[in-house]
Design a protein with these regions (language model features):
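N-terminal Rossmann-like dinucleotide-binding module
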Residues: 1-42, 122, 136
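Core-facing hydrophobic residues within beta-strands of well-ordered domains
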Residues: 23-25, 60, 141, 171
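Rossmann-like dinucleotide-binding domain that binds NAD(P)(H)
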Residues: 29, 142-179
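Beta-loop-alpha module in the N-terminal Rossmann-like domain of NAD(P)-dependent dehydrogenases
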Residues: 32, 42-106
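A contiguous active-site-proximal alpha/beta segment in oxidoreductase catalytic domains
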Residues: 90, 95-156
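Short loop/edge segments at beta-strand edges and connector loops
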Residues: 51, 91, 120, 175-178
């Protein structure tokens, strides 16, 4: 079974997603150190909890920036140290809160030769890929309904990504309802 969240709630140290060989989380940082320490425990204490944001991008191959505050307004600040060091960086959705921040991150990545990527995990979730492939076997559909993650920006982004991952990018019309 695949789960949207990668740990069982009652057993947070039990991973439910397949592990990637040769990949290891070695450093963590959070403005609230206790949260980084808790995350380190989930990985059996292997990741070092860094005291400063700047330290988390030292001697690593990739920086992963999670959806920290939900709207991406902190992503420029969080990505800058690693990008300046030329470290490949993945930024969870949304990429940035403003177009100005997005351009700044792109310029930093380009200037320092740092690969930069952002997406919603809904685009690549194994169950979504399986459903999309099976949907194609039926000849497609004329109508689809996606129940999303609410009205916060992160929830809307997941809904859009799930819709495109399922039905493709040729969607002709969308109706959004809230309440």
């Amino acid at each position: 079974n695949w789960y949207y969240f990668y740990t069982y709630y009652c057993r947070p140290t039990m991973m439910t997603a397949k592990q990637v060989s040769g990949f290891e989380i070695v450093k963590l940082w959070d403005a609230d150190r206790s949260l980084a320490e808790m995350a380190s425990k989930v990985f059996y204490g292997r990741p070092v909890v860094c005291d400063r944001l700047e330290d988390v991008s030292d001697d690593v191959d990739l920086v992963f920036i999670s959806d920290c505050n939900g709207d991406g307004s902190d992503h420029l600040e969080l990505s800058t140290p690693g990008l300046k060091k030329g470290v490949a960086t993945f930024i969870d959705k949304p990429f940035a809160y403003t177009l100005k921040d997005a351009y700044k991150m792109l310029r930093l990545a380009d200037k320092h030769g740092a690969p930069l990527m952002s997406l919603s995990m809904m685009r690549t979730a194994p169950t979504v890929v399986q459903f999309r492939n099976r949907l194609a076997e039926t000849g497609g559909c004329n109508f689809g309904s996606i129940y999303g993650g609410g009205t916060p920006l992160a929830g809307l982004y997941h809904s859009i990504a799930l819709t495109q991952a399922t039905f493709g990018t040729g969607i002709e019309s969308v109706q959004a309802m809230a309440g």
